Amino acid sequence: MKFSHSLQFNAVPEWSESYIAYSNLKKLIYSLEHEQITLQQGAPDEETRLLEHERRSPDDRFMFALDKELQGIVEFYAPKEKEIADQYGRIKGEFETYENEYMSQGNNINYPTPERLQKSSASRKSGRMARSQELPRITSSNREIYLNGQTSDGGYAAPAISRAESTAIQPSEPHDVDTSKNGLSKKQHSEAQPEVQGNDDEVEEEDDDDDDEDEDEDEDEDNNNNNRWLLIEQYPSDIVAYENFVSLKRKLTQLYVSIHDLISYVHLNYTGFSKILKKYDKTLGSSLRESYMKRVNQAYPFLPATGKTLSKRLNIVAEWYAKLCCQGDTFVAIRRLRGHLREYVAWERNTIWREMMAMERRTQAARLSGLKPVAADEKESEQPPYFTIKTKFGVFRIPRCFFNSTIATLITIIVIFILLLSFPVIDNREQNNCLALLVMVSLLWATEAIPLFVTSFLVPFMTVFLKILRDENGSPLSGKESTKVIFSSMWNPTIVLLLGGFTIAAALSKYHIAKRLATSILAHAGRKPRSVLLTNMFVAMFASMWISNVAAPVLCFSIIQPLLRNLPAESDFAKILIVGIALASNVGGIASPISSPQNIVALQNMDPAAGWGEWFAVSIPVSLLCIFSIWFLLSFGLLKDEHITLAKIRSTKDTFTGVQWFISIVTIGTIVLWCLERRFDEVFGDMGVIALVPIIVFFGTGLLTKEDFNNFLWTVIVLAMGGVALGKVVSSSGLLELIALKIGNAVSSLNTFRVLLIFSALTLVVSSFISHIVAAMVVLPIVHEVGSRLADPHPRLFVLASGMMCSLAMALPTSGFPNMTAIMMENEAGKRYLKVSDFLKAGIPATLISFVILLLIGTPIMRALGF
């Protein structure tokens, strides 16, 4: 969450105009940055001459704005503190008076004891009328005081009597303290509430453990509600004390909230100054933060003595409340008082996966926003929401929502599936059923008629239902046996390897390690368009190696925001830069085994799986050549703005923390173990077991939370599991062997390179039009089986080359996650940077170049390694 949002949500509504104008200061920073770049370019236009006329430096102008904000905060704080101090003094006198009169040892107030409570309860039915005639009548005004003055957290209580007695005198319908005049509302306190005293952490940690105690108190309250008015009427000498008790309790609650709000006001403004100065230093390359924060620390609201005074008064108010209502238990008093505080919205670090989920939600919202709103006085639609079909059996109404292209596609696929089952094209029943399932699942994945992960769940369901799986003897498995086999295949070491990659990506992004490394590299890229483009492409490729090419574009696009923000509106460098990062991320998808989901599928279809060292030996030279070739294409073929001066990306000046070092060491250690996995085969057994190391360490130590785990791209994980299940089904049924035999006979006369050329081209075309991972799940099992049946078998060579080709298919905006992320990029006006034609101009030649490099450079390396 951005601090501007945190400030908005946590500010006291009545004081909203008196907080630091964080958003305005941020706009000023961007304005100063733009002016600085304009002056550096030296353009002899009117804007430049006006800027040169401005004599003050950016530091002076920004300090002037900060001084104005600081003065406003001081001017607001001083009278507000005096107001609360006066209120504190008045309530202190009232409490001392109440304590001397009613809470001393020698008081004569006739409080009801348990014995009296029992007697009064037993004699209520027989003597109510007589007593009501003898005792003074309770007026409507007094009754209103009783009803409005009580709360549900303890009822009538004073330290001189027991808690059980205190719950006896309460209103029949519990009411909270009415604080509406002060803008207060009772909300559940968040654990992220700012602390005000040493034991507050313990107080908040125990909140959830007090539910049973609260329920017991509520039960006592309900049991004694019937005796309420009877006891007050029996003991009229308590009425004055009770009125004073209710009034004092309300005032203490309001005072506690007011002091706490003032503490929160100081805390939020101090954080705001610190963050906005850090942003200024980072954006303009200044060092203003340290010097100006000294000035902030000397302002009256931020003096240590001022904070200590507020905290001391807050604790004293809690002690008074404890004496008045909680038998002197300050722990309980603080918990109850905090129930009246505003809910605090905590700031949390984002992982890259949470940002991707937010992007997906924004995309969905954009789709929904395209629907035309209907005015209140208009009909929702000129057409009825259903079709009416009249038959001799009656009138049938079918909703119009069933008549669209998606439903038509889904119905067509289902019809094809039923036809394949009804009219077998293969004599063997299991193989024919498997063919029908394979065709249906492939079409559903290709058309996305239903969500991709839902189709993955359809695979095990239809496998068991159609009795497709067979045992080693060729006999069909029963439903129970099929269930065990298919679900056990879906959870395997390859899926755990994917989870391990997601975990590393989450840790590196949450603690800004990946971003710091990227900005440190980009800070040395200079300001020339070609060098900036090349550096960004290398950063995107390197990031894809370790946080996957699904997440790397999101990281890179966030880093280049200062560049995009300061480019002229008519510049085409923004398009070139975004396309370059997307294409480089696709290339980075082949750089390591965890850099893309399709690599996981490739490993699953290799026996034995390629080691990390073998993978790097192929991927690094191919990736570097592809990056240089695509950069040359973009720089000298498509880039027109060659002489613009770009904003400089500045690296952070913060030192590497202990947590960041720990995460880096664990990550590097895991990667080293992956590279040396063959040497530790007897120890770990598989790369999936090594992938458990970062999962256990990062989640076990609390560096990553269950929310981070929930934010993983589970749709991708389930999709990979569905692909593994489909591969198991096609292999077990014998269909894969049959398909491989047919294709093998057709290409038996061709040499290995020509067969590889055919499969690589087929994979490239399929991956360009459907998802990369879907293409890998459908094509790679067939490629492996065909490769193993050739006269010169090289199944691992075919699988590795075809798997890499899946990532290198990048011609269309829908070809892979990086392209889909890039096409959604918008400028500050909400207009997209790229059109489909922009991708076609760069994507088609980039794909063909990468195809040639992989075949001419990658294939000889694979052969040399024994693939």
From Swiss-Prot:
InterPro entries: SLC13A/DASS, SPX_dom. GO terms for cellular component: endoplasmic reticulum; endoplasmic reticulum membrane; plasma membrane. The chain crosses the membrane at residues 406-426, 434-454, 485-505, 537-557, 576-596, 616-636, 656-676, 683-703, 712-732, 755-775, 797-817, 842-862. Residues 138-152 have a biased composition (Polar residues). It is a multi-pass membrane protein. Residues 198-223 have a biased composition (Acidic residues). Keywords: Endoplasmic reticulum, Membrane, Transmembrane, Transmembrane helix, Transport. It is found in: Endoplasmic reticulum membrane. The keyword Endoplasmic reticulum applies. Residues 105-152, 165-228 are annotated as: Disordered. GO terms for molecular function: phosphate transmembrane transporter activity. Belongs to the CitM (TC 2.A.11) transporter family. This is Uncharacterized transporter C3B8.04c. It comes from Schizosaccharomyces pombe (strain 972 / ATCC 24843). The lineage of its organism: Eukaryota, Fungi, Dikarya, Ascomycota, Taphrinomycotina.
